[in-house]
Amino acid sequence: CLQFGSTCFLGDDDICCSGECFYSGGTFGICS
């Protein structure tokens, strides 16, 4: 899985170790 702070995209929550992709309105987010 992707570690904390890794780049992720909309709908990618399941690939983050935390299970959450945090968005701040950009084209990509970071795994939180």
From Swiss-Prot:
GO molecular function, one term: toxin activity
Keyword Secreted appears in the UniProt entry: yes
Signal sequence, renumbered to the chain: none
Subcellular location, record wording: Secreted
Tissue: Expressed by the venom duct.
Transmembrane parts of this sequence: none
SS bonds (residue pairs): C1-C17, C8-C21, C16-C31
Keywords carried by this UniProt record: Amidation, Disulfide bond, Knottin, Neurotoxin, Secreted, Toxin
Annotated GO CC locations: extracellular region
Serine amide sites (modified residues): S32
Keyword Magnesium included in the entry's annotation: no
Top-rank taxon, per record: Eukaryota
Functional description taken from the UniProt entry: Elicits hyperactivity when injected intracranially into mice and produces paralysis when injected into the pedal muscle of freshwater snails, Pomacea paludosa, but it has no apparent effect after intramuscular injection into the limpet Patella opea or the freshwater fish Lebistes reticulatus.
Domain notes: The presence of a 'disulfide through disulfide knot' structurally defines this protein as a knottin.
Protein name (database record): Conotoxin sr7a
